[in-house]
Amino acid sequence: MDKLRIMSVFGTRPEAIKMCPLVKELASRPEIESLCCVTAQHRQMLDSVLEVFDIKPDWDLDIMTPRQTLSTITSKCLTGMDEAIDSLKPDMILVHGDTSTTFAGALAAFYHQVKVGHVEAGLRTYDKYSPFPEEMNRKLVSSIADLYFCPTVNNKNNLLKENITEGLFVTGNTVIDALKTTVRENYRFSTEELNRLPYGEKKIILVTCHRRENYGEPMKNIMLALRQIAEQNREVELVYPVHLSPVVREAVDKYLRGAPRVHLIDPLPADEMHNLMARCYMVMTDSGGLQEEAPALGKPVLVMRRETERPEAVEAGTVKLCGVVQDDIVTMAERLIRDKAAYEKMAHAVNPYGDGAACRRIADDILWYFGRREQPAEDLA
């Protein structure tokens, strides 16, 4: 019997962190030929992740251009995917999450009548402009997909409410699998400034901020809040790997650069980021992935957004929404800095995103779907 040709498609750093462990798990199965197609929606940041996981793509669309728009990303992905699908002839295409690459990859698969598996399916805010464009991307992919790999039961229930009743699996989140590869106790950073940080002596706060819906006034508020936190709390050090987006960098330069106890560094490879997270005191972010990663490492997360598509993290107590108003951000951050009981409650809450076996479950479910296994994997409880 011929091997199943399963092609994983991704283009951004967060997608790569979550998909690389799955690419490797699929490659370990004798029934599967694991193929990898990258769009390079984020070229430099993507390549650093591929290097960490030692993955060499079978196809590289290399679409990134300076100040690219959502329309150009999507159209280039669609055109490039035509050639990739014709050449590699996959039996199924796996897309992840909610990026423009995700949407274009699923749509291209549909045009070629190739089955689609959606990894990290079922996340919703029910506001099509927040996060933008991610909420609409994932809803559109849900209309196309054949298999839905949901991180949590809550995600599965979201899809059931939309009358999607077949091909639903609860797997946990593949990012927990990634952490098992990257986090090491005696890790030494290649970024020397990180080796010199006073871990244990001061409270290291890891910061990220990059989302499109935060461009403009919200980002200004966030930067001013971070500055205020650093100025008012001598016991903290803020470490901010600054996204390559020109919009983000302009805001950082205007409102945050030069503040005391703030370390502005370039984006970090996945292993550096995960090991910094493992050593920090807490995380402040507008990222989706960090809401899943940090709790697995026992780190409280403040989310600098108006809403989150990860309500199970809020319900579990690992994450708190602090919004995008300067005073609110400062108040919630300073509570965790100064109130040990509040900090410990978040740090010891149970992470709802699984046990690090999501990739195994997904591979088993795919084999079952194609009749190469008698039973699907047992869903994550």
PLM region spans:
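Nucleotide-activated sugar donor-binding and catalytic core shared by glycosyltransferases
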Residues: 1-240, 245-381
